[in-house]
């Protein structure tokens, strides 16, 4: 098998390395709008692997030579490779969101409807999140009343990052929005949100959102671009029979204040705090790439379809609008794609 890696940045490197660590690694074809960056990554990947790693300057040649495509470019550059993969009928793994624009994302979902599409919401492949979902589905918590998500990054991104990745809702909290939908099985029907610029960045660096789910339950999401102690991402679910938490362990960058006034870590045997998302979700990233390989080689179902990803993106975009306008935004819970005319235009 030969996999095209479109995007030679951090996520392209991460997914390519994971593919090469497989017992029978596929050959890789690397493409980036920066040819020098593509060559640097290919040289780095080729060291110590039996797989062949080559570079293609043209996107069309990359698609022609590949059996599957991994799209890991900035969000504003995903349209072209996704449409090329759609025309070729290739299985596609794409980082979230599908693109920075909500309407364009709907067009892409329609264009990719006949392909095997896996969108990279890695929490769906995290063992702890998967176990939490199993327990919720089994009724261990009873009826879900409230979901609370914490999403604190260790360090703020560069100002230019938001120009290609989207705001804190579309870039960061979209993961938690998708997790809420996936864990509870309930879509969002309304959202209220707020954000503030308290640091030196150009966009919101702290934000909150309250989701109203179709069954009446609520989800409260909190995000920050800065946590001086490390990377802190957690979820808590409260139901009529009990509650469960994921992400609270000896590496969580949080200290509990005891009655004696001293702080202690949340778990026994304190360890260095998580530093970033690749640290916290290392296992999830490996498992999602393995899931994509099974989608390609065995026809296994995608852990996250285009329609599911689009639903999360629509809620994230609505949260951004709610924060900017100070209003509650109502949403249609049913997934739907773009008008056929838009899709036809996008595919040309």
UniProtKB/Swiss-Prot annotation:
Transmembrane segments: none
SUPFAM superfamilies given in the database record: Glyceraldehyde-3-phosphate dehydrogenase-like, C-terminal domain, NAD(P)-binding Rossmann-fold domains
BP terms from Gene Ontology: streptomycin biosynthetic process
The keyword Oxidoreductase belongs to this UniProt entry's keyword annotation: yes
Top-level taxon of the source organism: Bacteria
Entry annotated with the keyword Oxidoreductase: yes
Stated name of the protein: Streptomycin biosynthesis protein StrI
Taxonomic source organism: Streptomyces griseus
Gene coding for it: strI
């Amino acid at each position: 098998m030969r996999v095209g890696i479109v995007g030679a940045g951090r996520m392209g490197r991460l997914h390519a390395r994971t593919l090469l660590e497989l017992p029978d690694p596929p050959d890789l074809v690397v493409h980036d709008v920066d040819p020098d960056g593509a060559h640097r990554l290919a040289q780095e990947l080729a060291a110590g692997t039996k797989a062949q790693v080559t570079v293609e300057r043209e996107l069309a040649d990359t698609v022609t030579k590949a059996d599957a495509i991994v799209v890991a470019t900035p969000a504003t550059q995903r349209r072209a490779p996704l449409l090329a993969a759609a025309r070729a009928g290739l299985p596609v793994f794409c980082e979230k969101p599908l693109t920075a624009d909500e309407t364009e994302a709907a067009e892409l979902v329609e264009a990719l409807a006949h392909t095997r599409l896996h969108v990279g919401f890695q929490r769906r492949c995290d063992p702890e999140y998967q176990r939490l979902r199993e327990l919720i589905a089994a009724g261990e918590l009873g009826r879900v009343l409230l979901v609370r998500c914490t999403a604190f990054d260790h360090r703020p991104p560069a100002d230019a990052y938001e120009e290609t990745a989207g705001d804190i809702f579309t870039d960061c909290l979209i993961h938690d929005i998708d997790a809420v939908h996936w864990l509870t099985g309930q879509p969002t029907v309304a959202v209220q949100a707020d954000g503030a610029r308290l640091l030196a960045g150009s966009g919101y660096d702290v934000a909150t959102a309250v989701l109203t789910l179709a069954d009446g339950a609520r989800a409260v999401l909190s995000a920050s671009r800065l946590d001086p102690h490390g990377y802190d991402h957690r979820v808590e679910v409260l139901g009529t029979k009990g509650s469960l938490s994921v992400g609270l362990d000896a590496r969580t960058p949080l200290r509990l204040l005891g009655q004696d006034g001293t702080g202690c870590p949340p778990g026994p045997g304190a360890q260095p705090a998580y530093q970033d998302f690749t640290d916290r979700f290392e296992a999830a990233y490996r498992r999602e790439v393995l899931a994509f390989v099974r989608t390609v080689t065995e026809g296994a179902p995608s852990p996250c379809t285009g329609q599911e990803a689009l639903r999360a993106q629509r809620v994230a975009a609505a949260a951004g609008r709610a924060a900017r306008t100070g209003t509650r935004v109502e949403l249609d819970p049913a997934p739907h794609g773009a008008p056929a005319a838009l899709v036809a235009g996008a595919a040309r």
